[in-house]
Amino acid sequence: LECHNQQSSQTPTTTDCSGGETNCYKKWWSDHRGTIIERGCGCPTVKKGIELNCCTTDRCNN
């Protein structure tokens, strides 16, 4: 599985997920800097107030 791993609005980059990982994620939240977006492999548990989108196809998390 190939997932995007760039932060916020940086130039898109991808990573090959290891260990049979089947999910990519994108999570985002807002603070004094604006909206922060984090992407990567897996489907993490997030705290209240953080939006999370998990998906299961290559490069689906941009």
Swiss-Prot record:
Enumerate the CDD domains for this protein: TFP_snake_toxin (cd00206)
Which Pfam families does UniProt cross-reference here? Toxin_cobra-type
A GO cellular component annotation in the UniProt record: extracellular region
Which residue stretches belong to region Disordered?
1-20
* Cystine residue pairs: 3-24, 17-41, 43-54, 55-60
Q: What GO molecular function annotations does the UniProt record carry, in alphabetical order?
A: acetylcholine receptor inhibitor activity; ion channel regulator activity; toxin activity
Compartment annotation: Secreted
What this chain does, per the entry, is described as: Nicotinic acetylcholine receptor antagonist. Binds to muscle nicotinic acetylcholine receptor (nAChR) and inhibits acetylcholine from binding to the receptor, thereby impairing neuromuscular transmission. Produces peripheral paralysis by blocking neuromuscular transmission at the postsynaptic site. Induces concentration-dependent inhibition of indirect twitches and abolishes contractile responses of tissues to exogenous acetylcholine and carbachol, in the chick biventer cervicis nerve-muscle preparation at 100-300 nM (in vitro).
What is this protein's name?
A: Alpha-elapitoxin-Nn2a
Provide the species name.
Naja naja
- What are the top taxonomic ranks of the organism? Eukaryota, Metazoa, Chordata, Craniata, Vertebrata
